[in-house]
Amino acid sequence: MAQKFTILFTILLVVIAAQDVMAQDATLTKLFQQYDPVCHKPCSTQDDCSGGTFCQACWRFAGTCGPYVGRAMAIGV
């Protein structure tokens, strides 16, 4: 039973890491931003970016909508 949990946990970590790497890929980011009108739109709260498919995070320091990546995904920007 413990081995099954270990295998499932390892698979989960690999999937999370792969998703994080893919989200940081510049080509993929540019492709999504090209088709998401919310990207780089000025915002002050998360609700301002809620209509986006890829750029759903309000980056406070930039004041624009952007994607959740890396640490920002964990802390909710």
Swiss-Prot record:
Transmembrane segments: none annotated. The keyword Disulfide bond applies. May play a defensive role against insect attacks. The record marks V69 as: Interaction with carboxypeptidase. Residues 1-32 form the signal peptide. It comes from the Eukaryota. Residues 70-77 form a propeptide. SUPFAM superfamilies: Plant inhibitors of proteinases and amylases. This is Metallocarboxypeptidase inhibitor. The keyword Disulfide bond applies. Ovaries. Coiled coil: none annotated. The modification Pyrrolidone carboxylic acid is found at Q33. Induction: The MCPI RNA, but not its protein, is highly induced by wounding the leaves. InterPro entries: COpept_A_inh-like, Proteinase_amylase_inhib_sf. It comes from Solanum lycopersicum (Tomato). GO terms for molecular function: endopeptidase inhibitor activity. Disulfide bonds join C39-C55, C43-C58, C49-C65. To potato MCPI. The presence of a 'disulfide through disulfide knot' structurally defines this protein as a knottin. Keywords: Disulfide bond, Knottin, Metalloenzyme inhibitor, Pyrrolidone carboxylic acid, Signal.
